């Protein structure tokens, strides 16, 4: 059981980690080291011996091992990432890097993804140290860099260059592994993450005929691009069920007394309520336009 001090530390650590701006815009501009040092200091306070590891200066990862009571048991990896996606202060009612506690809530970028979990990991380990608690199995604790971009400086680097640190790990709990599904009826579902969706980035470029904004132009590059982007955003890709997803759908259907229909998953998704968005992303590919850029002057049609 968590003591009150551990609960207070979760709030404190979340707030303080948020105040360390680790925005990852891609391109290697992020610096997680201050947050990594913060986490390492608190791990050391729990009697652990954390390692700080970098592929690129400033892109720091933290790894520590908690010895379990049963050396024959498989180890468990518990991990979180230290970087966050960027935030524009003008879009927030509370500054995104203030870590302000208001109305019983911690506000800021990372409060959900995922400095909150980083803080919980740290607080639990420190609480165990105070209470003299040891887990049955070894725990490998990892706080990684670069999750919000390529992961080349984070988990990719650790897996490629330091696999020995994860020796014996057979399962992991992280941002999505052991994620709880809530279907809106009070039912809690605990899925097992067996893999990740692949990712591809595409750049779509449209050309046209340049001209003055006061004249009709049926070869407008902006409207051509907008039409293409709309089609991409509205397109529903066909079902594509991997063997792992089929197994998951079979188990989910059984929870509701249904037979899994691999040709029509709509009924099952409807049963899942709020959790449907998480499951729907596993049954088909998807494409989302995220950035647009066009023109250079308000009265000039770009070519």
Model-identified regions with their sequence ranges:
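Acidic/His- and Gly-rich active-site-bordering loop/insert found
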Residues: 2-109, 118, 128-137
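Predominant activation on well-ordered alpha-helical scaffold segments within soluble catalytic domains
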Residues: 15, 40, 119-126, 156-159, ...
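Catalytic cores of nucleotide-enabled group-transfer and carboxylate-activating enzymes in metabolic
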Residues: 38, 294-296
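Fold-independent oxyanion-binding glycine-rich loops
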Residues: 80-82, 175-177, 206, 292
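Acidic/histidine-rich catalytic neighborhood of metal-dependent amide-processing enzymes
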Residues: 106, 112-191
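A generic structural motif
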Residues: 112, 147, 208-214, 296
């Amino acid at each position: 059981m968590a003591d009150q001090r551990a609960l207070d530390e979760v709030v404190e650590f979340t707030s303080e980690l948020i105040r360390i701006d680790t925005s990852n815009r891609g391109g290697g501009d992020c610096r997680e080291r201050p947050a990594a040092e913060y986490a390492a200091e608190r791990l050391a306070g729990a009697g652990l011996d954390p390692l700080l590891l970098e592929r690129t200066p400033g892109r720091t990862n933290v790894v520590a091992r908690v010895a379990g009571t049963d050396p024959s048991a498989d180890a468990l990896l518990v991990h979180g990432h230290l970087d966050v996606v960027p935030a524009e202060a003008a879009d927030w009612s509370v500054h995104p890097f203030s870590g302000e506690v208001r109305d019983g809530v911690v506000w800021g970028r990372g409060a959900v993804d995922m400095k909150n979990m980083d803080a919980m990991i740290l607080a639990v380990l420190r609480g165990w140290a105070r209470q003299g608690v040891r887990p049955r199995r070894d725990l490998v604790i990892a706080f990684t860099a670069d999750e919000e971009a390529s992961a080349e400086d984070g988990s990719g680097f650790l897996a490629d260059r330091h696999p020995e640190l994860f020796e014996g790990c057979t399962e992991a709990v992280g941002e999505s592994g052991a994620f709880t599904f809530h279907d809106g009826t009070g039912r809690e579902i605990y899925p097992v993450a067996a893999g990740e969706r692949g990712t591809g980035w595409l750049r779509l470029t449209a050309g046209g005929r340049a001209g003055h904004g006061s004249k009709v132009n049926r070869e407008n590059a902006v409207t051509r691009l907008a039409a293409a982007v709309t089609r991409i955003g509205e397109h529903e890709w066909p079902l594509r069920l991997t063997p792992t997803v089929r197994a998951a759908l079979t188990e989910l259907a059984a929870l509701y007394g249904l037979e899994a229909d691999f040709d029509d998953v709509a009924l099952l998704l409807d049963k899942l309520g709020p959790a449907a968005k998480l499951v729907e992303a596993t049954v088909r590919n998807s494409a989302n336009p995220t950035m647009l850029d066009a023109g250079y002057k308000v009265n000039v049609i770009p070519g």
